[in-house]
Regions:
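Conserved N-proximal alpha/beta basic substrate-recognition cap immediately N-terminal to
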Residues: 1-38, 42-43
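A structural signal for short, well-ordered beta-strand elements
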Residues: 24, 57, 285-286
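Solvent-exposed alpha-helix faces
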Residues: 36, 69, 153, 296-298
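Conserved anion/nucleotide-ligand pocket segment
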Residues: 40-61, 198
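Internal nucleotide-binding/catalytic subdomain
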Residues: 54-195
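Active-site "cap" helix and flanking loop/linker of ATP-utilizing ligase/carboxylase catalytic domains
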Residues: 146-170, 187-257
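Peripheral (often C-terminal) accessory segments that flank ATP-dependent C-N-forming ligase machineries
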Residues: 212-310
Length: 310
């Protein structure tokens, strides 16, 4: 359901789960002809796993066709791009909802908003995620009820009907369009960096909830979240998700270290070095969203490495 976007789209189409109109292609000329017919903006996705970088939101026909050729002909993402999904462009706020499910019951976690673009102002290429806030300010109780009825429960029922019952953490990437919530993608795991903003708000014991998920007793479990907000800011190597340098020493204050989630970094003796694009995340929780965001950026100032970008 995550490793093949074509599988996920076909599943949604078969079981009437709302999502964007799409077509699947394995050859560039056919895909480019479809793009010519549909026009832009349009979305091109590598079918397989691509570390969160296999999606191009093309603003022009030429940009979309270049993305298709890069994936299918140039094999930018190897076999993951041998097949591409071309989707209609959707507009609206994005929402991430992680959930616990034992295949029968489903319990959504507090909603979140992932910021995927590399630059401020929703600009730049897509990344694995440059930060997240929870809860999502656009996700109302009414929208949550609609998603439960039309998306969440139908998805786990569809997996059961296909003989592939899902048990674990199921992530719903949603867009709140004018015609209602629609699925952008599924992940069969905790999202990064959404998890770093969501789990600090969990009041219940995580191990107990996960045991209930694996044991098939989730319907009887207590899953509670606090009413506050949390913000995770990703500190990246400048240049990510394209070319960047690594191997720089990382220093941080004691307070920042207490709120730090290490990602693209490695130990060299007693020294922590950068070793990836998204180096680490800093999370702050507070009674309000504004206070959580301010707290996360204040903590991020306590972290330093040569090409830090956030």
């Amino acid at each position: 359901i995550e490793a093949s976007k074509a599988f996920a789209k076909d599943l949604m189409q078969k079981y009437n789960i709302p999502t964007a109109k799409y077509r699947v292609f394995t050859d560039a000329p056919s895909a480019c002809a479809y793009i010519d017919a549909e026009g832009a903006p349009i979305v091109v996705k590598a079918d397989g796993l691509a570390l969160g970088k296999g999606v191009v939101v093309a603003q022009t026909v030429e940009e979309a066709k270049a993305a298709v050729r890069a994936m299918i002909e140039d094999k930018t993402f190897g076999q993951s791009g041998a097949r591409v999904v071309i989707e209609e462009y959707m507009e609206g706020p994005e929402v991430s909802v992680l959930s616990f499910t034992d295949g029968e019951a489903l319990v959504p976690m507090v909603s979140s908003m992932d910021h995927k673009r590399a630059l401020d102002g929703d600009k730049g290429p897509n990344t694995g995620g440059m930060g997240a806030v929870a809860p999502n300010p656009y996700y109302t109780k009414e929208i949550a009820a609609e998603c439960m009825e039309n998306i969440f429960l139908p998805t786990i029922r569809a997996m059961r009907a296909e003989g592939r019952p899902f048990r674990g953490c199921l992530y719903f990437g949603l867009m709140l369009t004018k015609s209602g919530p629609k699925v952008v993608e599924y992940n069969c795991r905790f999202g990064d960096p959404e998890t770093q903003a969501v789990l600090p708000l969990l009041k219940s014991d995580l191990l107990t909830v996960m045991q209930a998920t694996t044991n098939g007793t989730l319907a009887d479990a207590s899953v509670e979240f606090s009413t506050g907000s949390a913000c995770c800011v990703v500190l990246a190597s400048e240049g990510y998700p394209k070319k960047y340098e690594s191997g720089f020493p990382i220093t941080m204050s004691e307070e920042a270290a207490a709120h730090c989630y290490v990602a693209g970094a490695k130990k060299d003796g007693d020294t922590l070095l950068t070793a990836g694009g998204r180096v680490l995340g800093i999370t702050a929780a507070a009674p309000t969203l504004r206070a959580a965001v301010e707290g996360a950026y204040r903590l991020a100032e306590g972290v330093d490495f040569a090409n830090k970008y956030c």
